[in-house]
Amino acid sequence: ILDTQGLRVPTGQVGLIHVHQPAYADFSYVGNDDARRSMERSGLKTMGDLGYLDEEGFLFIVDRASDMVISGGVNIYPAEIESVLQLMPGVADCAVFGIPDGEFGEALAAAVQPQPGAAIDAAQVIAFLKPQLASYKLPRRIEFVCDMPREDTGKIFKRKLREPFWSGVARRI
């Protein structure tokens, strides 16, 4: 587990997961050599997952580095909020992501797909999350969607959820 400078992080601290995999297939991103180089460091490779090792050496995956939100200088991992929100009655699916914020750089937004026939509103979502999360982890904006945009693999396509909020914004965090 390495920090952004490529140094090992202490036990329990979140960093970028790197692995040594000699049988890893050699590939390149067409027209983007920097993307390939960013995945490798001193013979180690990363797929962009964040995690930490506990005192017994067990690995805990926290989130994807590309999904992390930095709000007011604090790193927030959307997967933590999503795991709580998915427990809310009436929620079929959800995604949490960063949107521009003039004061903090980024703020949290949640896209919520209600279960068929469920009637939930933003106030109920916040009321459900509030006792379980720190206040800075509460989404400032709740959007309700009929269907989540999905990649071919079935994963939620968060970039499509973020894009409308970031269009016209010069700086993307």
Where in the sequence are the language-model features?
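Short secondary-structure edge/capping micro-motifs at helix/strand boundaries
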Residues: 35-36
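Acidic/polar alpha-helix N-cap and adjacent early helical turns
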Residues: 163-173
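Short Gly/Pro-enriched turn/cap motifs at secondary-structure boundaries
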Residues: 8, 39-43
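Short proline/glycine- and acidic-rich turn/helix-capping motifs at secondary-structure junctions
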Residues: 143-153
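Hydrophobic/anchoring residues in structured secondary elements
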Residues: 1, 96, 143-144
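AMP-binding/adenylate-forming catalytic core of the ANL superfamily
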Residues: 5-10, 16-21, 27-28, 50-137, ...
